[in-house]
Structure formats: C-alpha cells, structure tokens
UniProtKB/Swiss-Prot annotation:
Belongs to the Cu-Zn superoxide dismutase family. This is Superoxide dismutase [Cu-Zn] 2. It comes from Zea mays. The keyword Metal-binding applies. Binds 1 copper ion per subunit. PANTHER family: SUPEROXIDE DISMUTASE CU-ZN -RELATED. Cu cation binds at residues 44, 46, 61, 118. The gene is SODCC.1. It is found in: Cytoplasm. Zn(2+) binds at residues 61, 69, 78, 81. Pfam families: Sod_Cu. Its cofactor is Cu cation; Zn(2+). Its EC number is 1.15.1.1. Keywords: Antioxidant, Copper, Cytoplasm, Disulfide bond, Metal-binding, Oxidoreductase, Zinc.
Length: 151
C-alpha cells in the first residue's frame, strides 16, 4: 500500500487530503476541507508541486496524455480532473473519491504534484465557456497543497 498526504492552505481555506493505493488498483482520496463557501468547488490534481507563487504556480491540470478537460467519469479527461466537491452550509467538505487515473507510483504518479480546490463549480467541460475544455471554468484557486509520500 502506498500512501500520500497533502496539507491544503489558502487565505481562508484549509484542509488535509489523504491518498492511498493498493497495488495497481485505483487511488482512494479522503479528507476534509474547511472555510469554503457552501456549494460545489472544482477539485483537481495540478501538474506542478510548486507553490512559490501560491496556488498559481501549480500549473495546469495534470494531463500526461494530452486530453481535454472533462468529468471524472469521462473517457476524455485530464488525469487530474476529479470533478467537484460539495461544501455544506458550514463550509466543510468531506472528501471521498476513488479514481484510477491518479496513481501514486509509476510514470504518471501524482507524488510531488499539487491538489487544488477552486472557488467555483467545475462545469466538467460541458459549460460552453471558453475555459470549459481546459479548466472547467472553476474560477480562482482558493487552496492547494503538495502531494507527498506518507509512511
């Protein structure tokens, strides 16, 4: 079992996200995020583990095979497209995602990359906005953290 963790930090938003993968199976993503406005928020793995300029320096969505942005269940999607997480009235998200395109080992490993939560909902590439096919038009990056190996 490979395990990883990302501590999310933003101006008002914070959280801890855990990743685990057994063998070649899917990766399970769990944890919680607080300080969000109620509703949907885009949630993605970004290509770079660089936070020197805050969340802006984490680069685009992790996309090792050059696809367009989409929903987690779409065949045509960035590997890092994890869809939306939902914050309750208290601004808290409890994350529980299982995904097969974000491995913790191998050539497309997400270790050392960043996980980012966005201000707005991800339209899953279906919104018709000029940014729909690249970012899901999910708005600003309100918190991010670098995915690191865990013992």
């Amino acid at each position: 079992m490979v395990k990883a963790v990302a501590v999310l930090a933003g101006t008002d938003v914070k959280g801890t996200i855990f990743f685990s993968q057994e063998g070649d199976g899917p990766t399970t993503v769990t944890g919680s995020i607080s300080g969000l406005k109620p509703g949907l928020h885009g949630f993605h793995v970004h290509a770079l583990g660089d936070t020197t300029n805050g969340c802006m320096s984490t680069g685009p969505h992790f996309n090792p095979v050059g696809k367009e942005h989409g929903a987690p269940e779409d065949e045509d999607r960035h590997a890092g497209d994890l869809g939306n997480v939902t914050a309750g009235e208290d601004g808290v998200v409890n994350v529980n995602i299982t995904d097969s395109q974000i491995p913790l080992a191998g050539p497309h490993s997400i270790i050392g990359r960043a996980v980012v939560v966005h201000a707005d909902p991800d339209d899953l590439g279906k919104g018709g906005h000029e940014l729909s096919k690249s970012t899901g038009n999910a708005g600003g990056r309100v918190a991010c953290g670098i995915i690191g190996l865990q013992g």
